[in-house]
Structures are given as structure tokens and as C-alpha cells.
Amino acid sequence: MTEQRPLTIALVAGETSGDILGAGLIRALKEHVPNARFVGVAGPRMQAEGCEAWYEMEELAVMGIVEVLGRLRRLLHIRADLTKRFGELKPDVFVGIDAPDFNITLEGNLKKQGIKTIHYVSPSVWAWRQKRVFKIGRATDLVLAFLPFEKAFYDKYNVPCRFIGHTMADAMPLDPDKNAARDVLGIPHDAHCLALLPGSRGAEVEMLSADFLKTAQLLRQTYPDLEIVVPLVNAKRREQFERIKAEVAPDLSVHLLDGMGREAMVASDAALLASGTAALECMLAKCPMVVGYRMKPFTFWLAKRLVKTDYVSLPNLLAGRELVKELLQEECEPQKLAAALLPLLANGKTSHAMHDTFRELHQQIRCNADEQAAQAVLELAQ
């Protein structure tokens, strides 16, 4: 009598955020099926949970057109090899975690061979290049989406999608401890505090830092003792920000932080930030915010024609209205940014209303995403 093979799940993660999601999914699946086998492209966290890595995640973690072109032959070789090896292995389910440019084609290749496929983390198809939804529909049996409006978009096109909530919403408390965060950063409990988050990419820090610093200078006129915290994602961004500050606002005293973005948000009365995941994190930290964003004029012109949503920040997309002020392009200038931030720093009605809505939205997307994703995989594997 042949021994029944264990549940076999193939996974591909292409960057650190995907490695974190993959590790959480594997952990949740092992609770249900302790002897399951996990195999594919994995980072250190997934490997620590027991995933066999046929390739290291770093192989796929390339950014920017020039880098991708330089590595294209290798990336195509890896995808062809995975198509062949997964085809021979016949896993019960394949889970492509984010990395849509790599994974969606791979999912399509495997689906043609009768392998069930899941795409975990929806690309921003609801915002731009909406026709990608048809390719995703052909390539996958199921999309796992972090946000409810993403599921609504897929439903419109009859592409199977399951809203599982957001892992970040699971990780962050509904009621953060502001004073504890201030103690960590050395900020007095009774001070007014502003966080500046000019982005994680070099181009963003270059475009936004000067305006953000000038905004802080204006706010200091109203709040002379205003504490200003600036978390920067790495040494490179810190160096870049310090150079810009030396030119624009050499006398402005600020607390520069290495990482610690979440602590800075929790500790602050208001934040001025670039759009992106930081806006969602800031909402979950219950920190009132203003989104300021600039890009090169041609890029902005193009984006305006391609982007199909009314808002750029996730809190507004979740709320379905302008909950958070978005000041983009010409609007992203110190006078307007300062005017939008002043009522938030006052800690009055505006801030409290925003805080309450942030809490409601947090509850909506706090669904134990790892467990929800595991349930979806197990149901498809049957």
C-alpha cells in the first residue's frame, strides 16, 4: 500500500513583504496540517517556517527597469524552470505572493497544467491598467485581497476573489499607547508632536523633503515648542534628508530616527507623509495626517490619465470619501500643507472625528488575514 503524500503547497515570494506574508501563511497552514510540505522561492522567514527554497527570494527582488533588463534572462530561466518542476511535482495548490509581473504568468502556465493557483495580494488593477484583471482571471483560481474595495472590483469582472483583511491591521493594536511611544522616542507627554515621512524611495525624498521641512518651519511659528520626528527607512535616505535639510532648514531642530516609523506615527499628534503603505500604517496608528505628493510633471500628467480612482491614499479609498487631505503636485506646497496640518495639531474636533473613523476602518480590515488565507488554500486544495 502506497503511503499518501502530504499536502504539498508551492509558493513564490519575490520580496521581503512577500516573505513575511508567506511565513504567516505557512504558520497558519501548519496549525491545520502539521505534516504539509512547502516548496518554492522563499526568503529567510519562510525558510525558518520550513519552506524548501528551490531559489532564494533575492533572485527575484529586482527593482527599476534597468535592473530588470539586466536580470531578464535569469528571471525568465527561473520562471521556465519553476513551470517545469512544479508541473512535475503537481502541488495541491500554487500560491504566488505579490510580485505580479513574475507570478501571474507563472500562475497561468501552471493552471494550464491543471494545478490550482492563488494570487495573494491584489495588484492595483482597480487603480490603473484595469485590463490586467482579465489576465489575472485566466491565470488564477482565486485572488486573496487585503481590502474590501478590491474584492468589489473583482466581483464586477466575475474573477473569484476573497477579502481576507490586512496583516498590518492584525499586527497593530486598535488603541495604540501614545505615551509609551513618546517615552521610547524621548518626547514629553504634553508636547505637540509632528511626524514628517517623506517616503522610502530616493526620488520621493528628493521631491518632498524641502517642502515638508518648510511646512514644519511655518508650523513652528504657531507652536514654538513643536517636536518634529523624522523616521527614515535606511542610512542612504537619512544621508539624503540631512543634505536637503542643511540647504533648506539648517536651524530647524528635528529628531532624526533610523526606522521607527510606526513609533513616530503613534507618538505624533499629526503626520505629513507621502502616499503609499505609510498612509495605511498611519491610519492604523490612529495618527491624523495630511498626504503631500509630487512627481515629475510628465509622470503626473500620465498618472492623471491612467489612474481610475478619485483618491490616492488608502484611508480615503477605504472610507470612500476625502477623510484625509491630499495635496498633490502644485498643491503640495508649504503654505497649503501647513494650513491643512494646523487644525490636526490643535487636537480638537477634527482630530477626534478622524481618529474615530480610523478606528472603524481598522476594525473592518482586521480579520486575522493569515488564518483567512490558510482557510482559502485548504478549501481550494480539497
Swiss-Prot record:
One of its GO terms (cellular component) is extrinsic component of plasma membrane. The keyword Transcription does not apply. It is an enzyme of class 2 (transferase). It comes from the Bacteria. Pathway: Glycolipid biosynthesis; lipid IV(A) biosynthesis; lipid IV(A) from (3R)-3-hydroxytetradecanoyl-[acyl-carrier-protein] and UDP-N-acetyl-alpha-D-glucosamine: step 5/6. Signal peptide: none annotated. Transmembrane segments: none annotated. CDD domains: Glycosyltransferase_GTB-type. Its EC number is 2.4.1.182. GO terms for molecular function: identical protein binding; lipid-A-disaccharide synthase activity; phospholipid binding. Keywords: Glycosyltransferase, Lipid A biosynthesis, Lipid biosynthesis, Lipid metabolism, Transferase. InterPro entries: Glyco_trans_19 (IPR003835). It catalyses: 2-N,3-O-bis[(3R)-3-hydroxytetradecanoyl]-alpha-D-glucosaminyl 1-phosphate + UDP-2-N,3-O-bis[(3R)-3-hydroxytetradecanoyl]-alpha-D-glucosamine = lipid A disaccharide (E. coli) + UDP + H(+); a lipid X + a UDP-2-N,3-O-bis[(3R)-3-hydroxyacyl]-alpha-D-glucosamine = a lipid A disaccharide + UDP + H(+). Belongs to the LpxB family. Condensation of UDP-2,3-diacylglucosamine and 2,3-diacylglucosamine-1-phosphate to form lipid A disaccharide, a precursor of lipid A, a phosphorylated glycolipid that anchors the lipopolysaccharide to the outer membrane of the cell. This is Lipid-A-disaccharide synthase. The gene is lpxB.
